[in-house]
Regions:
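Solvent-exposed loop/turn segments at secondary-structure junctions
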Residues: 216, 514, 667-668, 687-688, ...
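A short, well-structured beta->alpha microelement
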Residues: 365, 675-691
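Membrane-integral, polyisoprenol-dependent glycosyltransferases
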Residues: 2-558, 606
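Flexible, charged surface loops at secondary-structure boundaries
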Residues: 421-425, 651-656, 688-694
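Periplasmic/luminal catalytic loop of GT-C fold multi-pass membrane glycosyltransferases
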Residues: 433, 689-784
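Membrane-proximal, lumen/periplasm-facing interface regions of secretory-pathway glyco-
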Residues: 452, 456-460, 584-585, 589-660, ...
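Signature aromatic-anchored transmembrane alpha helix within multi-pass, membrane-resident enzymes
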Residues: 496, 511, 543-615
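Phosphate- and divalent-cation-binding pockets in alpha/beta enzyme and binding domains
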Residues: 152, 485, 670-674, 707
């Protein structure tokens, strides 16, 4: 595949050394370099771009295959890698420590249960192709459970755990969350590959902030699809950035894989497409405008001319956003109208039939496209083997593009088209395998994979699950992410004042996600990570100058009081030498003082941030009333109930899981997963099994547990009396911050007085600050703590003495 890469192989040290020198010509300088305006170009980078074109024009048959030779890492590489490996290890420990301690959330139990079903399906996969035996069900993609990615890979974790001899035959609360913790750790590692854009210190800071972020840690210990999507989104960012920088095909393939996996994870990928696609359009508009001079068209002696931009680039971007803004307005209005239409009971059948026709057309066309694409790639591989690959050359529109000032257009117009085909093939294979459930449901998987997710997402805009106000994330994120919020704002300011394309992209990504997720009907705490992730990278950009200045000062101070040999050794072969050059001009005392104050402020803000992370991830992970981020969570009472069920089964059947259990419909989740080893469970009890009598155990849930008590525990016509035990299945955070129209009192009064403000009370800043402070350090709830969903355990009287009360 060498001839497709279009770049010679570089070792990591060489790549690090070369990349910072020509960053602005690609997407902007590293953060340690002196920033310039986005219209300026670096003339001495022409040789780098020209070398790229020389590689493009080489004949494939003239290339000499190069073999990678193993060589031990250099001191410079070690000094670069060790700090990153240290913070990645920190992130892994925070994510894997006590991973299975918390009971499974309602949604986690669904994901765990159907992943286990998929694992069992793979043992009899032919039954899922042909009509299965009566009573045998196969997992198929349904957007109600979101994308198929997590079910395939959690099932894979189950299988690996079984092979390794993990407890409970490899299926337990820990193995359910291993995938989330693994990809959450991967998020911590990914900024390492953005060193050319963030600088080494900036990249390390991004890794560290992601490692200790309360939201990133908590939801990396939570088997929901959002942490997977966040990983794949950041993987796309890394892949695109690295591809524009190196032109190596593997990075474009990684980008395509990241997109395909994200699409196979959650429908919110549509929002990612909106943000990334609109920024791509703005960047293309900017680069198109760069070729048209503006200032030079006017009289240079006029004082007004000096205020004009050099080119039409700002004008084209303004025009682009004006058009895009109007288009977005109509798009959102269309989405709303379509959502209302398809959820109207009078239109449901017509909407379903229309979507089914779209699926049928897609199923007829997409496989043919996939086969043709695969055949084309096979031809390319054959020609590669024969040494007859045609390498892309600069021709046509590419001749009119300035590689330095228009790197994106240059990338698009001069890249080998083989890169696109391999990337598309990679995405197509991932889509087909996951949505067809490993080729067991090809027709349904293709049609549903293309249309059903979008259809479901449009329907959910009217459901508005959670009914949260527009300011939900503006309350939630500052409560937990103190260092991220403060330095994220500083990062935005720095990115605007000292812009590079990558910095502006991060700002656009953060602001775009904040707006879109606040606009979307469904607002949940797990969605906050799509906002906090770019915010934390911006926080690294905001904090980096102060850290660099302080490290520089300490190194220079050490060198002043060291021998010349020690001072030379301090700077020689330094993995961060490019960010702390020996010839760097002295920084003024005032600037140094400001930098030290900035670092001190960062440490002070880090304290509540880390404290919040510790509290939500390890102290109150199953305590909804005391953690806004937890929102609603299964309580540890579920473990208590299961311990009693297991004890009864041990008493009656020697632990063979043969006991009959009645499970009412309101208690199905999470108990469908917790009772997975009990084959004699009657779901939707008692209507689900009218012939069952004298059931040893009944588990019920609902808003009226006392009605269940009357039915099974105290009814005079019930000869088989049951012992009644009341527990809490789920608890939740108080929602008094909602506006009065949706049952709250508003955020100001709620923060000031809780749920019961005095008559004619107004927002009180002092009381609000006091309540937030008490919540930060004592976890004293702001509102009511009694919100709960009850459950009832009934044990037949003749067995009640077999277990402890």
């Amino acid at each position: 595949m060498k001839s497709f890469e279009t770049e010679p192989i570089e070792d990591a040290a060489a790549a690090d050394s070369a990349s910072n020198k020509h960053e602005l010509g690609r997407l902007g300088p590293s953060s340690s370099e002196k920033s310039t305006t986005i219209e300026e170009e670096i003339s001495d980078e022409r040789d780098v771009v020209d070398s790229d074109l020389v590689v493009y024009e080489e004949k494939a048959e003239d290339e000499v295959p190069q073999r990678r030779r193993f060589s031990p890492p250099t001191r410079e590489q070690l000094l670069t890698w060790i700090p990153f490996w240290g913070v990645i290890l920190l992130g892994a420990v925070l994510r894997f420590w006590g991973l299975g301690d918390k009971p499974l959330h309602h949604d986690e139990s669904l994901h765990a249960y159907y992943s286990l079903q998929l694992l069992n399906n793979m043992a009899h996969w032919t039954w899922c192709i042909n009509p299965p035996p009566q009573g045998y069900s196969c997992y198929i993609y349904t957007p109600l459970l979101h994308g198929p990615f997590q079910f395939h890979f959690i099932a894979l974790v189950y299988k690996i755990s079984q092979l390794l001899g993990a407890p409970d035959n490899g299926v337990n609360t820990t193995t359910v969350r291993i995938l989330a913790a693994t990809l959450g750790t991967g998020i911590v590692a990914l900024p390492f590959f953005l060193r050319d854009y963030l600088g080494k210190v900036g990249a390390w800071l991004a890794c560290f902030l992601l490692a200790v972020s309360p939201s990133m840690v908590y939801f990396s210990r939570f088997a929901r699809e959002d942490i997977y999507m966040a990983f794949f989104t950041l993987l796309m960012v890394v892949g695109i950035a690295r591809y524009v920088h190196t032109r190596k095909m593997r990075w474009l393939v990684i980008t395509a894989a990241g997109f395909a996996f994200s699409y196979a994870t959650k429908e919110a990928t549509f929002l990612t497409i909106m943000v990334f696609g609109s920024f791509l359009g703005a960047l293309i508009a900017w680069e198109l405008g760069l070729k048209a001079p503006l200032r030079s068209r006017f009289n240079q002696e006029s004082p007004v001319v000096a205020w004009l931009p050099k080119s039409f680039a700002p004008v084209t971007v303004l025009v682009y956003f004006a058009i895009a803004g109007v288009a977005a307005k109509y798009l959102f209005a269309w989405i709303k109208s379509v959502s209302i239409y398809i959820t109207d009971p009078n239109n449901v059948n017509a909407a379903n039939n229309y979507v089914q026709r779209l699926k049928d057309i897609t199923v007829a066309i997409v496989p043919v496209i996939g086969i043709l694409l695969g055949a084309f790639v096979l031809v390319l591989l054959y020609r590669e083997i024969r040494g007859k690959v045609v390498v892309a050359k600069r021709r046509g529109l590419a001749n009119k593009v300035d590689p330095e000032r228009q790197p994106l257009l240059d990338t698009i117009l001069t890249m080998p088209w083989t890169h696109w085909f391999f990337a598309l093939l990679c995405a197509w294979v991932i889509f087909l395998l996951l949505f067809s459930v490993m080729l067991t449901n090809i027709r349904g998987g293709i049609g549903d994979g293309v249309w059903q997710g979008l259809y479901y997402w449009l329907q959910q805009q009217q459901v508005a699950r959670g009914s949260q106000p527009w300011y939900y994330y503006l309350m939630l994120i500052p409560l937990y992410e103190q260092i991220g919020v403060v330095f994220g704002l500083l990062g935005i300011i720095r990115s605007v004042v000292q812009p590079t394309r990558f910095r502006l992209f991060l700002v656009y990504w953060f602001v775009g996600n904040l707006i879109l997720y606040s606009w979307a009907a469904e607002k949940m705490p797990w969605l906050m990570i799509h906002i906090t992730m770019p915010m934390l990278i911006l926080a690294a950009i905001g904090l980096e100058p102060a850290v660099v200045t302080c490290i520089n000062f300490m190194k220079n101070l050490f060198a002043r009081f060291s021998s010349p040999k020690e001072a030379e050794a301090l700077h020689a072969n330094d993995g961060y030498a490019q960010e702390f050059p020996k010839a760097r001009p002295k920084v003024g005392i005032f600037a140094t003082s400001i930098s030290f104050l900035g670092v001190i402020m960062a440490v002070l803000l880090l304290l509540p941030t880390v404290h919040n992370m510790y509290e939500v991830a390890y102290v109150h992970p199953a305590d909804g009333p005391h953690e806004m981020m937890v929102y609603v969570q299964t309580t540890t009472d579920v473990n208590t109930v299961m311990a009693k069920v297991d004890a009864l089964d041990q008493k009656m059947f020697g632990g063979k899981h043969q006991m009959q259990i009645g499970l009412t419909g309101d208690a199905t989740w999470p108990y469908a997963w917790y009772l997975r080893d009990y084959p004699n469970v009657c779901f939707d009890f008692p209507t689900g099994c009218p012939g069952w009598k004298n059931v040893p155990v009944i588990i019920g849930g609902g808003d009226n547990p006392y009605g269940l008590e009357q039915q099974y525990g105290g009814a005079t016509n019930n000869p088989d009396k049951y012992t009644y035990q009341l527990y809490k299945m789920r608890t939740w955070w108080d929602e008094g911050y909602k506006p009065p129209a949706t049952g709250g009192i508003g955020p100001g009064l709620w923060l000031s007085y809780g749920d019961n403000p005095p008559l004619n009370a107004k927002f009180n800043l002092g009381l609000a600050a006091q309540h937030i402070w008490q919540w930060w350090w004592q976890r004293r709830a702001i509102g009511d703590t009694g919100g709960a969903y009850d459950m009832v355990l009934f044990i037949r009287n003749d067995l009640s003495t077999a277990v402890k009360p």
